[in-house]
């Protein structure tokens, strides 16, 4: 991850600069774990089964929404998932579709955004079978648009607020009058509606609305299938009407009326009719229906219910007669007509004959029971149908507002009945399925057309996809020429036999053979016919179709209603012109098929003028139970909805596409050149930013195409990888913040602990050093000391294995052997173990000293696993004495008062023997310490053994060890027995640069390498290496400011650091930042100058100037001989090997020659001859020696030849540097390959030194402010 330079950290929060509409990235708190794929175009395998499987996975995870591009797939959950709350609504407000999970709110937000941004009217087409959730989806879209368009924070007029409330109130009102409980759905829409919301073009707030009604199912008023219900309003009214209505309209419970009880379903689980009736009344009041209008509505509903209770008996002539005249009398009271006129209109039919233009005779023909029942039901259906139409028109009057005087920008919501297949299908089903065929046709056409237009507009190559065009089925139903369709055949049958319904049905059955001729989507059967719809094959019954197609009330009934004294009946519901249409013999009345055909075509024209959105709803089961998923049923819906073809069309070459700005908004975090700390920093245009992001993610060119305004991603796996990288970015940033915070807290704790320890040492002294001095006093003048024991940093810490910690190896040891006491001392060493018949052997052991006993623990491998066991347990009070030699060896004998075979004397070899003896003495003050040339102990109880110690300088003896053989220990000479530990040396800085451990979160990137620097005419000279804090600084030339590469103009630069009073600090910050940025920088060059010239810093590279005229110059004098150079510091030779294990020290091998720059007694500051390493070494290990003969180089190179008169010279400013470069180049060639390698090594070493020096300077300056935290995280 590249590090961008920035100034010193300020406590004042700095706002990120705004950039071209790209918002600062935010972590999505609401994002759920993805189950399946959220867009079906991202499926690896495209098939009906894979689509069904993906929908199943998401449904079981309560994720009911899935995309196909911009099409939303919704699976009805049959339960409240809590995903339509105010919190969810705000989550989708103003968000791009890619930023949030699939939801119906995302479709609504997209519609409203395009309306505002492009001024295009929008519509949403919601399709699916009955019970799939179309009405609920329409309600949620209305709820969302009403809320986002009327923002609470923006001042709105009372009229706009009223329009919003009325639009929302249409839902409960029309649901009560237009929805019913069916076998498949408890709230099935038995009509279609298209709601258009009109918006003000200036602020896009709703100012009006309009509802178009389609094909109410009138037949449901008079009859329902068993276990279904009539329209909701009848049950609401009969269960919850106020007492005044019960008294005035004679209303009783729903079980009283035939129309509400015949299907044997009065109550429905999950429906509260009383509560719904209260919402219906509230909706009426919101829309503006007056009390008189409401009374007339409920009076009409009561009359329909009582009409259904009119029953018939057969009289003496075999004609129908009223069974109970009180019922017809009460119906006449409700309709405010004469009771005899009502009975006559139901029981008789008036027939007029004509003779040409002359009026004929009039006949009153009595009806039988079947005919009278049909007349009764026709009256009830007619009243309800015209009442529903009037309610819709009355709502439109209230919603009209100011729409007529303004430019119309609308959002349309289509909620229409779904495809229906029943056991017996009649005229209602063919009309419903015809409308769904038209919607499927416009869906295919608009989807494919939009897809084709997009590829052409974006200049993207793609392959056309074959699909089923259902226009042939639509023509089968609606066509008039050249071959008439079903609707035309129905109308012709009515015209041929208008007086007899049975005869008209027979004529229609005969004409079916002509309708379906040569059409493979039609089959004619006796009394039935089959149409192969896109959703499946449906069998329709011929019987009754022609009668239902007439869609007109009998003239007798209309004439009876025109006599009503109620103006709502005779003028509003049944105006006089309605009767005039029936009496006009020159014009054929409009049939139901004519109306539905006209409405469907007008709907298609309206939708074609809008920018469409689509919601395809799916019903998961027939039992309406949550968490139940019928695979076969859903698979059938997936097939007939054409989801696979929709996916194939959408994925015609590319699985994902979006505009450049949205792509950048989503993924700019993935490139260090476009995103920094969550901010967008790219200065170029969006298309170049897209290319940079794809390049940083290493997406090959074959995986994407760039259009004119969109980027197209070919495979879903590419998008998945980028989304995964984006998710990891947030996790890595969170982890980085956590690390930085933990590091900050740890540093504070360490600093506090350091201050506390320093205060304790200052006040009470260092207890570990005091213990060390006490132990040294026990051996003072009696035993030679090892050099490592006399270090100033040596302290008696005791628990070297960490047994007192809660974890680690020491705790593991205690747990293995079952110890649970405080440990005073722990360490690893050896014991001398005697074997029968063989010489003694040194074996490794672990020593743990508690407050009461010394534990010797053995390590054994059992079945390749480490096992620890207590070998000896020696009570401290049982120790008689401890024996040590007078030499610098590590042997220690522990002799007991009464040794036993299980607890014998032991001979121990331990590096920290003096510390162990000290702790034993502290725990047992009466302990005797014997020091002599020999050590005596009992190998076995009663059998003493003596070990002799001799001093030897044989090279085979280790410097820091000894040799045991046959009871004799040979050891090298040690320090004087009177040696004292020096004062503890001052600790060196241990700051760490953490930035090198960071990698940008989630970005796929190869290992970064530093590119080679561009050649320069100046000779590169490394910056001086860092010096120790206590070392006197030598005088060096001031380094020249580095020259950077030309920056990328597209990347926005973070503001440079503020000017500092310390120039050296500023140079250090610049060098360190450039080093961490991995940019190409010119190494600072040593300026070779005359004694009368001043050094000048180079400026930015200027344009190339014309070459100067040739000037003849003499050759420069040869440089001084390198062999004559004197060393900067005295040279010393190492007499012994030193491992450099102490912090801040430097490792040495015997005979190494180093510089010594400082000596404080026991320790000396050493530096290697090439000045690449520096550290402390024991003064006792080194001795002064003359410098080596090859120090500083070998034979001086010969002077270069003088330049030719024709040779061009460089400008005067760089002339000396060029000469020096030439000199060094020739010298390097003369020295051969070894010299070149050595020069390369020195250059790398000095470069590292310059970076380290710069980092130290920057850290020192920052540490001067205690309030500031080190900036060691690169964002």
From Swiss-Prot:
CDD domains: MYSc_Myo1, SH3_Myosin-I_fungi. Residues 731-751, 752-777 form the IQ domain. Residues 1095-1106 have a biased composition (Low complexity). Residues 1254-1263 have a biased composition (Basic and acidic residues). Residues 1264-1275 have a biased composition (Acidic residues). InterPro entries: Fungal_myosin-I_SH3, Kinesin_motor_dom_sf, Myosin_head_motor_dom-like, Myosin_TH1, MYSc_Myo1, P-loop_NTPase, SH3-like_dom_sf, SH3_domain. It is found in: Cytoplasm, Cytoskeleton, Actin patch. Residues 977-992 have a biased composition (Polar residues). Pfam families: Myosin_head (PF00063), Myosin_TH1 (PF06017), SH3_1 (PF00018). Keywords: Actin-binding, ATP-binding, Cytoplasm, Cytoskeleton, Hydrolase, Motor protein, Myosin, Nucleotide-binding, Phosphoprotein, Repeat, SH3 domain. Residues 785-974 form the TH1 domain. Residues 966-1064, 1089-1128, 1183-1230, 1251-1275 are annotated as: Disordered. Residues 1127-1187 form the SH3 domain. One of its GO terms (molecular function) is actin filament binding. Belongs to the TRAFAC class myosin-kinesin ATPase superfamily. Myosin family. Type-I myosin implicated in the organization of the actin cytoskeleton. Required for proper actin cytoskeleton polarization. At the cell cortex, assembles in patch-like structures together with proteins from the actin-polymerizing machinery and promotes actin assembly. Functions as actin nucleation-promoting factor (NPF) for the Arp2/3 complex. This is Myosin-1. It comes from Meyerozyma guilliermondii (strain ATCC 6260 / CBS 566 / DSM 6381 / JCM 1539 / NBRC 10279 / NRRL Y-324) (Yeast). The lineage of its organism: Eukaryota, Fungi, Dikarya, Ascomycota, Saccharomycotina. The gene is MYO1.
